[in-house]
Structure formats: structure tokens, C-alpha cells
């Protein structure tokens, strides 16, 4: 499984969905995505 953007996450996993452009943010709480082709 994976976590959709703007949902709660932890650095230990599971991964954010579409992890080409999405990652758990600096505080390890929310999946954030870069804008662009893969960011939506």
C-alpha cells in the first residue's frame, strides 16, 4: 500500500503514493508532492 498526498505518513513507511514526486515532509507527518508532470 501507499499513502496519498496530504495524508499522514511517517519516515519509517509505508511510502507516499507516486514517490517519484511525493515524499514524507521534513517533520515526518504529511505526504507532500512537487508540482509538475508527476505531482498530481
From Swiss-Prot:
Disulfide bonds join 2-17, 9-22, 16-33, 24-31. Contains 4 disulfide bonds. Its main location: secreted. It is found in: Secreted. One of its GO terms (cellular component) is extracellular region. Keywords: Amidation, Disulfide bond, Knottin, Secreted, Toxin. The presence of a 'disulfide through disulfide knot' structurally defines this protein as a knottin. Belongs to the neurotoxin 02 (plectoxin) family. This is Toxin CSTX-17. The lineage of its organism: Eukaryota, Metazoa, Ecdysozoa, Arthropoda, Chelicerata.
Amino acid at each position: 500500500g501507499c499513502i496519498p498526498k496530504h495524508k499522514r505518513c511517517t519516515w519509517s513507511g509505508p511510502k507516499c503514493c507516486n514517490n517519484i514526486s511525493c515524499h514524507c515532509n521534513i517533520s515526518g507527518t504529511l505526504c507532500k508532492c512537487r508540482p509538475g508532470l508527476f505531482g498530481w
